[in-house]
A protein has these predicted regions:
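A generic, lipid-embedded transmembrane alpha helix
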Residues: 66-83
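Membrane-interface capping segments at transmembrane-helix boundaries
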Residues: 123-127, 247-256
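Hydrophobic transmembrane alpha-helical segments in integral membrane proteins
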Residues: 25-39
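Hydrophobic cores of alpha-helical transmembrane segments in multi-pass inner/ER membrane proteins
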Residues: 36-44, 104-119, 167-172, 230-246
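Alpha-helical transmembrane segments and their membrane-interface exit regions
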Residues: 165-176, 195
């Protein structure tokens, strides 16, 4: 009951956008946009070598759009509740539902880069995947650990919602997409390298103040340099969610 009252106060007192669409004329440097452009430029240069991925653009757009809608709703609610927010000095100045346009683009650019990396690894290292037994064990350990985290930190909004998403994503993976998970567990470790670079820049590696800030009262308060540890689970849920839908739309073929 105490938690429900506290959480209600968070959302009741949340800042409500006066306008759905908002534009700020004064912009310091649209660094957020530059980060997205730099992120997408590398895979775009090499897409010619992976024509199978290019041929499935419609599947990519569908899967990414579905996941983006879910995560944007989460994003908007947390932004309005003050659980995280954005520094407009490093954005173009155009905001929708209190989120800069760059944040909307994030949910299309990052999945594209990450899925491209996954399929590039599949193409160049076809034997780069785990066995079924070890994959199940890793998934079960992660699910159990995340369930424990959810139970012990249910009052922290980001930690709790992030844990819930991760539990659902891993469970779906084990039950329906085990072969996909066998490969993604390893490719995710590679994907985390550029993901941490992007997130590091967004959370203050090279700027006086972060482009994306977090209210540490609503997370564990554990940072990997400047990045909240919850962002790892966030990234996994977003990217593997994209991949599951992407493969679901695929004609009847092996999804390893």
């Amino acid at each position: 009951q105490t938690f429900r009252k506290r959480r209600w106060r968070v959302f009741r007192n949340a800042e409500r956008p006066e306008k759905i669409l908002h534009y700020t004329a004064t912009v310091m440097t649209p660094l957020y946009l530059y980060v997205l452009i730099a992120s997408v430029s590398v895979p775009l240069l090499f897409t010619v070598f992976f024509m199978d991925f290019i041929k499935r653009w419609s599947h990519f757009l569908i899967s990414t759009s579905i996941v983006a809608v879910v995560f944007l709703i989460w994003d908007a609610l947390f932004t309005m509740a003050g659980i995280w927010g954005f520094n407009e000095d490093y954005c173009l100045g155009l905001s929708i539902l209190m989120m800069p346009i760059e944040e909307w683009l994030f949910f299309f650019v990052i999945p594209f880069c990450s899925l491209f990396t996954h399929f590039a690894l599949k193409h160049s290292a076809p034997n780069f995947f785990l066995g079924e037994n070890i994959t199940r064990k890793i998934a079960y350990l992660l699910i159990a650990g995340t369930c424990l985290l959810l139970c012990t930190h249910f009052s922290k909004a980001y930690t709790a919602v992030d844990a819930l998403f991760l539990i659902v994503t891993l469970t779906l993976g084990v039950v329906f997409y085990l072969k996909l998970l066998q490969r993604f567990f390893l490719s995710f470790l590679i994907i985390l390298i550029p993901f941490f670079i992007v997130n590091g820049i967004l959370t203050g590696w090279i700027t006086d103040s972060p482009i994306v800030w977090y209210n540490d009262l609503e997370n564990l308060g554990i940072r990997l340099t400047t990045i909240p540890v919850e962002d790892i689970g966030y990234a996994f849920s977003m990217l593997f969610g994209n991949l599951m839908i992407f493969e679901f739309l695929k004609p009847k073929q092996d999804v390893k």
